[in-house]
């Protein structure tokens, strides 16, 4: 089973060319790889080396996102559709505390995720959640890491999200 997971993760790297997507956007120089196994986001250069590496939080539930509200992070190859100022955004987590200011941190990097709306990479008001499965499906970073990442990313950049071993098992 573990071999199947690693085969799947390796094949994900080939999907952009098979689907006609540009592997590394227009300049073919970098992409983002998010590992739900290692709980990391890596910005990788055109030669495969790390430019940046940050810890993340991802969806509370294991498996690939199937529907809105399932608390799962989607897996596959996506692209950045927009980068927006989220510093004024609020969110109600349904915990009785109401709308929380700063819930998304300073930016929201929206991903083009067919079939799912509102999935992206963003900051947090809850830094202790980084390294855990605590989101509704988005990828969460420390705010300072997000600010650093935003300096390097652009609309159209490829984002690959790979499953953990438990995510792969949850899909069976």
Regions found by a protein language model. Name each.
Residues 7-17:
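Bacterial N-terminal signal peptides
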Residues 21-68, 75, 161-172:
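Intrinsically disordered, low-complexity
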Residues 52-54, 78, 117-119:
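Short beta-strand segments
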Residues 1-4:
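Positively charged n-region of N-terminal signal peptides that target proteins for export
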Residues 38-40, 77, 108, 118:
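Structural motif
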Residues 26-27, 68-71, 86-172:
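Exported/periplasmic cell-wall-interacting domains
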Residues 78-79, 159:
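Generic structural signal for buried aliphatic residues
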């Amino acid at each position: 089973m573990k071999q199947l997971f690693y085969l799947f993760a390796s094949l994900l790297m080939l999907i952009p060319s098979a689907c006609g997507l540009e592997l590394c956007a227009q300049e073919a120089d970098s992409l983002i790889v998010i590992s739900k196994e290692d709980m990391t986001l890596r910005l990788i250069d055109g030669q495969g080396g790390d430019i940046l590496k940050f810890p993340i939080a991802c969806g509370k539930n294991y498996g690939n996102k199937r529907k809105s509200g399932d608390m799962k992070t989607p897996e596959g190859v996506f692209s950045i559709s927009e980068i927006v100022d989220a510093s004024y955004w609020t969110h109600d987590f349904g915990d009785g505390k109401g709308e929380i200011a700063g819930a998304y941190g300073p930016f929201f990097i929206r991903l083009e995720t067919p079939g799912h709306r509102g999935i992206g990479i963003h900051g947090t008001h809850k830094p202790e959640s980084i390294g855990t499965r605590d989101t509704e499906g988005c990828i969460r970073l420390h705010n300072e890491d997000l600010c650093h990442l935003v300096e390097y990313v652009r609309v159209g950049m490829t984002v690959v999200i790979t499953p953990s071993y438990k995510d792969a098992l949850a899909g069976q």
